[in-house]
């Protein structure tokens, strides 16, 4: 079997801490970028890096090409599209987030206006004038590097949609429509845009057509409207049987196969010999047919009765007179045969039908068709589409043509055409976007074939019939909608072009386009607020495919089949990860290796297998292409040459799992984790967990809150590094080089010479994100993991983000767990934790709250942000500066003022006394009321940042200016560093050129003809080096160039500083009526406490019930107390045994770390340590980690980093075996069963049985008790019912529901119940009375009528029933 060999090169972070892998399979191909589906889709939409001539017909280019050229109504002027270009965004992503702007770029389109000479008589008319111009078409949102959009300052993700592919689909009603259970077949042509066309059978086997789900019509009406006569229709759908009249006898041309299954109504003889083949009354069988074929019978004499009741295939006309004797599709009668004989007509053509496989469906439909001509058919369709409107010939023709045959109204799209052609058996995948006559005919023919038992219906849940519509495509559709709105307006204006000398800019109003785009990104169901709790949740959100949304399904109507796992999901869509609840199965996640092809179908990679030998060639297969292949799983046993060893191989074929021989196998899976999504691939020992629990595990990992200090999982799957780097939360080196400078907020890299191209700077400056608020209020903070002087490669991790540790995803903490009951505190999944976890801040998290204060211009005057607030004491203002804004670093609690603000009050009539006092004391403060921003209840924390936005044109306050200064200082610092490095680089090259050269003169004591030495250069100032004159002209020229470079560098730096300064000091574009906005960011520290929700990675979740002092916790014999106690009853019934295996392997990992720490403390030699590490990493003799490539220092750093435990990787479906876990435990000198004797911390007694103890990775989820706890005394009430509102956000009350009423009734607590239902709820009078009574010290209750009873009365009256209360 092939096993994962070591990579030759390790990244900077990887060298510091290797993860020991148990994987047996080699990774044939690297995992593609996890965000590629988003990035590629939008890249194809914009096509910014593609030349105009090379642009593909997709995205913006396709939208413009489909709408332009726009012609005027008269046809004398037209607008043509030439090309487009995107400008530079005004602000970068970080600035857009801070300022609340949309990260977008201006779109300019080159439009050509062509005016024709309307007076000319030529056709086509000559061109009179051409005007070209760049027209601004609004702003197009840009995608960030991590696949998100910044819209109005918040990060959003556009989720891909899984919708029904355009094309044709055949299905049946499963026997539900008709009581007999008969299957009614139907076909539906689904275009990308345009009217749907349905064909369906009714219980009487007639074929009907519906357009856009309207009233059904016989299908022959549609065929007549297409120009087919009855004769043509029968000719298309039926074979004919020809009958000749010879010597008074009827002879039919015999095709023996057509007689099969009929009952002979007369004796059939061989004409030559008279031999009897079939007796009258016997059924004609295959044996009889063989005899007829053998005797080579050409025709058959039939009695006249045999023809009666048969259907004519052609019109019967007397050629001499032109008289119609019968129409096609008429039945043959005695009279008709007589008439034909008398008119001398000797040939009759009949249609061939039988009940088995040549049904008479179209013939029956023709009989119920009321129309007789094309015009009548068109009128009938017009009546169905536009009921009540009087039809005219022109209107009917135009309507029918516009339905399916005009490109503007109908488009199958390339996908639809491909699917359509493949389904109806057309060879080519290309064709027009509109329907043709032949298309409609072929669909009806295929439908009739299926009804006749030839062919199968389609499976609509097959991933070959569902395709993914990604961001780019959805944006393109919205853009097209906007352009079509523009087109209507432009057409009207184009008629004015000749009279007024207008330019393209005057004709086009870009508002509808921007509005459509803005609406899509701002409020579409698929443009969602990004899930940003941790890096995994972001990656998963971008890889999500949803069946909901515009043009998709709705929760209520989606049945079980759509939600279920389908065989085609294998390797394309994860069978595990989907939400619990109403959306289950409708929202899915892409599998790890999945991608979409050019048609939008999901593909999965497979290795090619030739003659039972596996090659390294990888092909991507869609569900359509996969059906006929034999595909083996990736864990098939192979020999060294890649030949399959087993005699029978489990494989997938025709959407079934079966066994087959190796020579039949065409493909093989790439990797065992190919089936699952990113989140599920992070669960170790997933193969030992029940699917329902794995679903919860993958969903709960996305809710893990970033802890104060991230800690890598001891037991992982090897996917952690990939997820962390692709998520974009950590800083990854764009180019290799040397770390020049590093501090907490930025990293400066001096780039390698071979990685800089001309015109690029040789410096990379990475500004780290510090304590930034995520969409879910968690904290985004980056910490550098490199030191000055470190050499790094492109792609190395330079700084860890939230939930990453040394470049690996780290969502939680490794805790020492014991599976045992403890005084009932872990009953029903409760969790018991040690006080040490709280004390060590293992699960302390930082949450950042954004509080906003807005000063508006009101009718009574302007609101003002100030520290001068009426009736507020000095102490309340102690945290504010002179501008009235809180200081950074201030610790605030609920109710504290953050931003002082006063609002003008309406002028009230003053009494004469007040007027006198006002005149004496000049008291003016009473004109304003305090409307300051205060800390909301239940919140306290530290102010970490303040942003002040001032309207353009208003004077900035001192605080706003100081924030600007800080910002400018940061920009200046970056530019100074960049300039320093680039200057050093230039001077280094200058010194290299000058050394040992002969000078002709220069500053200082340099004599002509002397050589230049390093000492001389050290003494002379660097700026004067350029004044040194040299004999060699070529070198002089190079020096001159370097001198110019230095000048240009100075100018460039000044320009960049001024540009940044302009951006920073310009006023802000605020909403109308807003003068100033102050945003205060509070960092709230949340320690773990009872009521918080925790979970493992295997769906084992619970709520903390108690925090126990360390001395009371169960401890081992060496005194180590466990961190957390879980209930063992949570494992067997849930069937997530993965957590137990993880616990054992975690114990081994920690034990190995202890052994390494011991060796380091004993100062053992690097060779001894290397030998021990070799045993750990390459346990089965296969070199997975190449320790030889590390020098002694790197080895010792690695060993030091392993003190806390050796991280293990057990890949999904390819993980550690039980034997391997035992061998690791033994290597760490631990018991092989993973059980330990524990001692009760309170009594000092040993527990009766040994307990499973080990290390498990636990997460703290974003369901914190602080966010949920809530209490209310008085508050707001609902307007109609006057009952208190519900929920924490509305400061609501506790619901006293139906069942609580029953409980009080059962106790007979009548007064308590009355109080609950009246004065504590919606008895408005009683509420105020009881308040007054309590104030007066009188505790009696006087309940009145509950308001909800009055509402009930009003509702009954609304029904027209007079109801009144009788008062005694």
Curated annotation (Swiss-Prot):
PANTHER family, alphabetized: DNA-DIRECTED RNA POLYMERASE I SUBUNIT 2
SUPFAM superfamilies reported for this sequence: beta and beta-prime subunits of DNA dependent RNA-polymerase
Originating species: Legionella pneumophila (strain Lens)
One of the GO biological process terms: DNA-templated transcription
Gene Ontology molecular-function annotations: DNA binding; DNA-directed RNA polymerase activity; ribonucleoside binding
GO cellular component, one term: DNA-directed RNA polymerase complex
Protein name, as recorded: DNA-directed RNA polymerase subunit beta
Subunit structure: The RNAP catalytic core consists of 2 alpha, 1 beta, 1 beta' and 1 omega subunit. When a sigma factor is associated with the core the holoenzyme is formed, which can initiate transcription.
Catalytic activity: RNA(n) + a ribonucleoside 5'-triphosphate = RNA(n+1) + diphosphate
Pfam families: RNA_pol_Rpb2_1, RNA_pol_Rpb2_2, RNA_pol_Rpb2_3, RNA_pol_Rpb2_45, RNA_pol_Rpb2_6, RNA_pol_Rpb2_7
Signal peptide coordinates: none
The family this protein is said to belong to: Belongs to the RNA polymerase beta chain family.
Keyword Oxidoreductase: no
Keyword Nucleus on entry: no
């Amino acid at each position: 079997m092939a096993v994962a060999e070591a990579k030759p090169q390790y990244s900077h972070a990887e060298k510091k801490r290797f993860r020991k892998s148990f994987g047996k399979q080699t990774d044939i191909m690297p995992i593609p970028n996890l965000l590629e589906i988003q990035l590629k889709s939008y890249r194809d939409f914009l096509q910014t890096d593609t030349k105009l001539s090379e642009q593909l017909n997709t995205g913006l280019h396709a939208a413009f090409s489909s709408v332009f050229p726009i012609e005027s109504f008269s046809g004398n002027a037209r607008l043509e599209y030439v090309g487009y270009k995107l400008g530079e965004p005004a602000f970068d992503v970080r600035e857009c987030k801070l300022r609340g702007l949309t990260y977008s770029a201006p779109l300019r389109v080159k439009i050509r206006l062509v005016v024709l000479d309307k007076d000319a008589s030529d056709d086509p008319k000559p061109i009179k004038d051409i005007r070209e111009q760049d027209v601004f078409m609004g702003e197009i949102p840009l995608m960030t590097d991590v696949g998100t959009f910044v819209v109005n300052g918040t990060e959003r993700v556009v989720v891909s949609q899984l919708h029904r592919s355009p094309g044709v689909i055949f299905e049946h009603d499963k026997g539900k429509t008709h009581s007999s259970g008969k299957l009614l077949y139907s076909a539906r042509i689904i275009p990308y845009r345009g009217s749907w066309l349905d064909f369906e059978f009714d219980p009487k086997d007639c074929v009907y057509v519906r357009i856009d789900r309207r009233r059904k019509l016989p299908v022959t009406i549609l065929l007549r409207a297409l120009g087919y006569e009855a004769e043509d229709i029968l000719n298309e759908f039926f074979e004919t049987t020809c009958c000749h009249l010879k010597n008074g006898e009827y002879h039919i041309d015999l095709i023996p196969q057509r007689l099969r299954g009929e009952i002979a109504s007369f004796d059939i003889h061989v004409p030559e010999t008279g031999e009897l083949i079939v007796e009258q009354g016997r059924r004609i069988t295959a044996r009889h047919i063989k005899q007829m074929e053998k005797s080579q019978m050409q025709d058959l004499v039939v009695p006249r009765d045999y023809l009666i009741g048969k259907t004519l295939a052609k019109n019967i006309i007397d050629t001499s007179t032109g008289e119609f004797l019968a129409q096609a599709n008429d039945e043959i009668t005695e009279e008709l045969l007589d008439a034909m004989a008398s008119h001398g007509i000797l040939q009759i053509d009949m249609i061939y039908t039988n009940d088995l496989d040549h049904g008479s469906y179209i013939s029956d439909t023709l009989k119920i068709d009321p129309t007789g001509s094309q015009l009548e058919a068109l009128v009938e369709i017009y009546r169905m589409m536009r009921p009540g409107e009087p039809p005219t010939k022109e209107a009917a023709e135009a309507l029918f043509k516009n339905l399916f045959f005009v490109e503007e109204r109908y488009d199958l799209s390339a996908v639809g055409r491909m699917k359509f052609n493949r389904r109806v058996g057309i060879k080519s995948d290309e064709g027009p976007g509109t329907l043709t006559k032949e298309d409609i005919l072929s669909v009806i023919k295929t439908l009739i074939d299926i009804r006749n038992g030839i062919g199968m219906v389609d499976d609509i849940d097959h991933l070959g019939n569902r395709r993914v519509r990604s961001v780019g495509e959805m944006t393109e559709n919205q853009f097209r909608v906007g352009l079509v709105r523009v087109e209507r307006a432009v057409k009207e204006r184009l008629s004015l072009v000749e009279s007024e000398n207008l330019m393209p800019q005057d004709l086009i109003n870009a508002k509808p386009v921007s509005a459509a785009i803005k609406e899509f990104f701002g409020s579409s169901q698929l443009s969602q607020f990004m899930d940003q709790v941790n890096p995994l949740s972001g990656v998963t959100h971008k890889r999500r495919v949803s069946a909901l949304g515009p043009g998709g399904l709705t929760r209520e109507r989606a049945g079980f089949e759509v939600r279920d796992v389908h065989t085609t999901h294998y390797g394309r869509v994860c069978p595990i990860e989907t939400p619990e609840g109403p959306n289950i199965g409708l929202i899915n996640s892409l599998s790890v290796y999945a991608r979409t092809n050019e048609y939008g179908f999901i593909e999965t990679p497979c290795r090619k297998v030739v003659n039972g030998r596996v090659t390294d060639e990888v092909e991507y297969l869609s569900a359509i292409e996969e059906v006929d292949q034999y595909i083996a799983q990736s864990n098939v046993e192979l020999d060294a040459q890649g030949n399959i060893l087993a005699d029978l191989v489990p494989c997938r074929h025709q959407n079934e799992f079966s066994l087959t021989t190796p020579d039949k196998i065409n493909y093989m899976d790439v990797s065992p984790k190919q089936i699952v999504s990113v989140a599920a691939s992070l669960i170790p020992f997933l193969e030992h967990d029940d699917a329902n629990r794995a679903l919860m595990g993958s969903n709960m990992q996305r809710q893990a809150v970033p802890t104060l200090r991230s800690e890598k999982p001891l037991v992982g799957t090897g996917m952690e590094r990939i997820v962390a780097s692709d998520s974009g939360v950590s800083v990854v080196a764009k180019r290799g080089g040397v770390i020049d400078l590093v501090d907490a907020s930025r990293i400066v890299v001096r780039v390698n010479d071979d990685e800089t191209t001309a015109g690029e700077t040789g410096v990379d400056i990475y500004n780290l994100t510090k304590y930034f608020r995520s969409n879910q209020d968690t904290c985004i903070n980056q910490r550098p993991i490199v030191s000055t002087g470190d050499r790094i490669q492109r792609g190395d991790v330079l700084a860890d983000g939230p939930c990453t540790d040394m470049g690996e995803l780290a969502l939680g903490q490794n805790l020492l767990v014991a599976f045992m009951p403890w005084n009932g505190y872990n009953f029903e999944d409760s969790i018991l934790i040690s006080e040490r976890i709280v004390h060590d801040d293992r699960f302390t998290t930082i949450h950042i709250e954004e509080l906003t204060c807005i000063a508006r211009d009101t009718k009574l005057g302007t609101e003002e942000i100030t520290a001068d607030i009426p009736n507020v004491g000095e102490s309340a203002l102690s945290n504010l500066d002179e501008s009235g804004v809180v200081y950074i670093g201030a610790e605030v609690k609920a109710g504290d003022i953050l931003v002082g603000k006063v609002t003008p009050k309406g002028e009230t009539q003053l009494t004469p006394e007040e007027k006198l006092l006002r005149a004496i004391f000049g008291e003016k403060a009473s004109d304003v009321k305090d409307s300051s921003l205060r800390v909301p209840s239940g919140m306290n924390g530290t102010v970490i940042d303040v942003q002040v936005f001032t309207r353009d044109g208003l004077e900035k306050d001192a605080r706003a200016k100081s924030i600007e200064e800080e910002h400018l200082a940061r920009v200046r610092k970056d530019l100074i560093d960049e300039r320093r490095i680039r200057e050093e680089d230039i001077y280094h090259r200058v010194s290299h050129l000058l050394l040992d050269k002969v000078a002709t003169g220069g500053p200082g004591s340099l004599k002509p003809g002397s050589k230049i030495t390093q000492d001389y250069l050290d003494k002379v100032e660097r700026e004067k080096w350029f004044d040194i004159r040299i004999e060699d002209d070529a070198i002089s020229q190079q020096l001159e160039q370097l001198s110019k470079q230095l000048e240009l560098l100075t100018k460039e730096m000044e320009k960049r500083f001024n540009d940044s300064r302009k951006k920073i000091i310009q006023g802000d574009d605020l909403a109308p009526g807003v003068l100033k906005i102050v945003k205060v960011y509070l960092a709230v520290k949340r320690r773990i406490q009872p009521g918080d929700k925790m979970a493992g990675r295997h769906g084992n979740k619970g709520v903390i019930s108690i925090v126990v002092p360390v001395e009371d916790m169960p401890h081992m014999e060496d005194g180590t107390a466990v961190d957390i106690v879980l209930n063992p009853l949570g494992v067997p019934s849930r069937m997530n045994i993965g957590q137990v295996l993880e616990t054992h392997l975690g114990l081994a990992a920690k034990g190995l770390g202890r052994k390494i720490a011991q060796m380091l403390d004993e100062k053992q030699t690097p060779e001894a340590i290397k030998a021990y590490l070799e045993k750990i990493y390459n346990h089965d003799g296969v070199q997975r980690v190449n320790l030889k490539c590390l020098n002694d220092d790197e080895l010792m750093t690695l060993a030091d980093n392993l003190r806390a435990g050796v991280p293990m990787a057990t890949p999904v479906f390819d993980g550690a075996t039980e034997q391997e876990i035992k061998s690791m435990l033994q290597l760490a000198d631990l018991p092989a069963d993973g059980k330990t004797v524990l001692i009760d911390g309170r009594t000092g007694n040993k527990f009766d049985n040994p307990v499973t103890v080990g290390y498990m990775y636990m997460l703290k989820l974003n369901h914190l008790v602080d966010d949920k706890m809530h209490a209310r005394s008085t508050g707001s009430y609902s307007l109609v019912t006057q009952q208190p509102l519900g929920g924490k956000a509305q400061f609501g009350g506790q619901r006293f529901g139906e069942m609580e009423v029953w409980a009080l009734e059962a106790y007979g607590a009548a007064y308590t119940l009355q109080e609950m239902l009246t004065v504590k709820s919606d008895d408005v009078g009683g509420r105020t009375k009881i308040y007054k009574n309590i104030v007066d010290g009188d505790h009696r209750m006087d309940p009145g009528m509950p308001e909800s009873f009055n509402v009930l009365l009003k509702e009954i009256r609304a029904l027209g029933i007079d109801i009144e209360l009788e008062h005694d």
